[in-house]
UniProtKB/Swiss-Prot annotation:
Questin oxidase; part of the gene cluster that mediates the biosynthesis of geodin, an intermediate in the biosynthesis of other natural products. The pathway begins with the synthesis of atrochrysone thioester by the polyketide synthase (PKS) gedC. The atrochrysone carboxyl ACP thioesterase gedB then breaks the thioester bond and releases the atrochrysone carboxylic acid from gedC. The atrochrysone carboxylic acid is then converted to atrochrysone which is further transformed into emodinanthrone. Belongs to the questin oxidase family. The keyword Oxidoreductase applies. Keywords: Oxidoreductase. This is Questin oxidase. The lineage of its organism: Eukaryota, Fungi, Dikarya, Ascomycota, Pezizomycotina. It holds the Pfam family Questin_oxidase. GO terms for molecular function: questin monooxygenase (NADPH) activity. Coiled coil: none annotated. It is an enzyme of class 1 (oxidoreductase). Pathway: Secondary metabolite biosynthesis.
Length: 446
């Protein structure tokens, strides 16, 4: 039985968007690897943008149908960079039961192990659903902060939480909540709260999410907001939210979700995540995928998983979808708000993946060296296809990714990353010239 400190996977909860059964020994191998990670490794392997992806990698390969060898490969590919989990300060853990003491430590990465011990105790007593609801969705001052913290760090806290909930592993939920509480801030909470205030004060424009992305693309100040910064967090914190806070808030606040329309708006958000990931390219260069955009797709699966939970209220579900789309607009702007050109995806001709269907692509992805980003993206696209499909017919540009485009984007992700070193797999800010220097022009490749 899975507990707040012990991993115990079940074939009944082996991941959504599957195309095959679990191979012999896969569940047992995954249990061992995940327990090792839980017991030995820190959630952060460096102070900034250094998230431990081992849990994501192992569980995604399990969902893709990988066996013991593929699971071990996924674990080994990212094990060397991990660092040991720090010792727990029991006095601090006791103090975390006081809301003010808890609040004073939010956003401090060095408090991860203390938060992990605290949430493990809470879950052991109350169950993970009650603890998530209390600490993220109850509306208390601290819960509002942690709700927003789910979207910090390029969505990694909500991604980790969704893995714990999807696979029904209380110990992974405890890891996620500890990450949520200890993650440093890029200013996402203030942005989201400002959006909510703006939404209550202004009329609903009725603009679709695609239209809002195109509005960002057309806004010169937003397009240039992130210029001059070297990394994603700085582009968000100091660029988009620092230089153009009023403009991005006014834009993002226009995306609103009624609790009666969650499924439609969820599908719209998922579809648009795929749209910005595949349709943003650079003229004269081979197709590539932006590292930050791909996380909008991966996190869209995470929001879908949370929306599926009957114990989460419709009001919270609406907010989860609403906030995700608003943060997507921030990240699109932080990569330069590059022109969205759907033919760049629709006209793509697969190379290494030519002729593959989803099952074949799953097998190929499970076998290649990867730190988890490719595998998570491909599974999220397969799931997104199913969620979006009922709403695509007659939707026009509101749902730009339709039919074969879902598989084609997954093939593009595989083709452009397979057998490449990590620094050459993705574009780390697709709108900035310096990030394309390692990519030969199309003329140079002829």
């Amino acid at each position: 039985m899975a507990t707040a400190t012990q991993i115990f996977l079940s074939p009944d909860h082996a991941g959504i968007a599957r195309v095959s059964e679990c191979p012999v020994g896969a569940i047992e191998a995954a249990n061992h690897l995940l327990q090792t990670n839980h017991d030995e490794h820190h959630m952060f392997w460096r102070p900034v943008a250094g998230h431990n992806h081992l849990t994501h990698s192992v569980l995604t390969i399990l969902a893709l149908g990988g066996g013991p060898a593929e699971l071990q490969r996924a674990f080994d590919d990212a094990r060397d960079i991990q660092r040991p989990i720090p010792p727990v300060d029991r006095q601090v853990v006791e103090q975390l039961g006081d809301p003010e003491q808890f609040r004073s430590r939010i956003g401090q990465l060095d408090q991860y192990s203390n938060f992990l011990a605290f949430f493990s105790q809470e879950i052991a007593t109350k169950g993970y659903r009650a603890v998530v609801d209390e600490h993220c969705f109850s509306g208390s001052r601290n819960a509002e902060t942690l709700f927003a913290q789910l979207y910090e760090g390029l969505y990694h806290p909500v991604i980790h939480l969704a893995f714990g909930i999807e696979f029904e592993q209380p110990s992974i939920v405890a890891e996620a909540l500890a990450q949520v509480a200890s993650h440093d801030s890029m200013g996402i909470e203030a942005f989201l709260m400002d959006c909510e205030a703006e939404a209550t004060q202004s009329a609903h424009s009725g603009r679709t999410l695609v239209q809002l992305f195109r509005d960002a693309e057309a806004d010169e100040a937003l397009r240039h907001a992130a210029e001059g910064f070297d990394d994603g967090p700085a582009r968000v914190r100091d660029g988009v939210l620092g230089r153009t806070a009023r403009a991005i808030t006014a834009l993002a606040a226009q995306f609103r979700v009624d609790p009666q329309d969650i499924e439609h708006r969820l599908a719209e958000m998922i579809n648009c995540s795929a749209f910005i990931t595949g349709a943003v390219q650079r003229t004269g260069k081979p197709r590539k995928i932006d590292f930050f955009h791909l996380h909008t797709v991966t996190a869209s699966l995470s929001i879908d998983i949370l929306v599926r939970q009957p114990w989460i209220s419709p009001v919270v579900k609406a907010r989860l979808v609403e906030w995700k789309a608003r943060v997507d607009l921030v990240w699109y702007t932080a990569t330069g708000a590059v022109q969205l050109h759907l033919p760049s995806l629709l006209n793509y001709m697969p190379t290494s993946s030519a002729g593959m269907d989803w099952a074949a692509l799953y097998r190929a992805v499970a076998a290649v060296h990867d730190d988890g980003h490719l595998a998570k993206l491909v599974r999220a696209l397969k799931s997104g296809e199913a969620v979006s499909n009922p709403f695509e017919k007659g939707a026009g540009e509101t749902f730009p990714i339709q039919g074969i485009a879902w598989l084609k984007l997954a093939q593009m992700a595989y083709d452009t990353t397979v057998d490449r070193p990590i620094e050459q797999k993705w574009i780390w800010g697709i709108g900035f010239d310096e990030n394309w220097t390692h990519v030969l022009s199309l003329e140079s490749e002829k």
